Amino acid sequence: MADLNEVTQIMGANNAFVPGKRIKFDFGTDGTLLLDGVAEAVTNDNAEADADTTIKISFDNFKKMAKGDLNATTAFMMGKIKISGDMGLAMQLQSVTSKIKLNG
């Protein structure tokens, strides 16, 4: 199963960010992931980084979304995702996660 560093590499290699915008995933004790469309980079060492949207989700549920096993809208409606900031940007979440496919 992919860890945070592997996910960061996969997302970076697939340009999984929204140009000009910053989306931060807060995985709680599992860390953070910043999709930095300003710097055109994906990093995981920036817990305090500013973001246009912050999405709180468990790392396990994030991986399920990236594998296509969990729909972002469904996860939000079930309370598995909490969003702060630009809600419109968060609505693009499915298009971002569709740029990657995790195995296992």
Regions found by a protein language model. Name each.
Residues 1-104:
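Feature captures hydrophobic
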